[in-house]
From Swiss-Prot:
Keywords: NAD, Oxidoreductase. One of its GO terms (biological process) is alcohol catabolic process. SUPFAM superfamilies: NAD(P)-binding Rossmann-fold domains. Substrate binds at residue 138. Pfam families: adh_short (PF00106). Its EC number is 1.1.1.1. Belongs to the short-chain dehydrogenases/reductases (SDR) family. This is Alcohol dehydrogenase. GO terms for molecular function: alcohol dehydrogenase (NAD+) activity.
Amino acid sequence: MAIANKNIIFVAGLGGIGLDTSREIVKSGPKNLVILDRIENPTAIAELKAINPKVTVTFYPYDVTVPVAETTKLLKTIFAKLKTVDLLINGAGILDDHQIERTIAVNFTGTVNTTTAIMEFWDKRKGGPGGVIANICSVTGFNAIYQVPVYSASKAAALSFTNSLARLAPITGVTAYSINPGITRTPLVHKFNSWLDVEPRVGELLLEHPTQTTLECAQNFVKAIEANQNGAIWQLDLGRLISVEWTKHWDSHI
């Protein structure tokens, strides 16, 4: 899908990968970029507006751990203003296996709840126009970093949820694909806690291996948005965009 003249909501669009992706998105000329984030960053918002003054960039404070009803209320405000929204990017994430409940709440439940809320406006069974969802998951959803099993499991859950959304598109009219970054040089990975402190140096050990920059990841993210392939599992790793073929080991046959 061409980004030009589209209305986009980006949850966590001011984070490490998020901010660089927001920069790349505004360069492509959407009509509106609505950023929902827990922490306001007026400097970053001003920068995004300056990159392309023709794009309307707005910010709303948002914590993905709030109840679905609160998210629906916020989205009602946004939809009333924009009339239509073309793309939702779910990008919230934390990497800290000391915070077990919050890791699951942000990385998985938050994605589910935000998606559930926007269905109120998009679901074609309710007369909605449909839409597109891009969920930022992780390569750890393919193969875990076993020292951070809670984080890895939360991302695997988000990936499975996204795959199901794509299969439900004929019913809901909402398509979906996953964005799965490899190890990217962000503040998230420089220092983080392993589960039960099984490996205090896990962040340092990861950074001893090849990584990618947030800009490389962001540029490939935009390519994935433009490809707009329902059900795609995109691996964004070492500056490359790779379409992953998922191996089916079991089928419900329904």
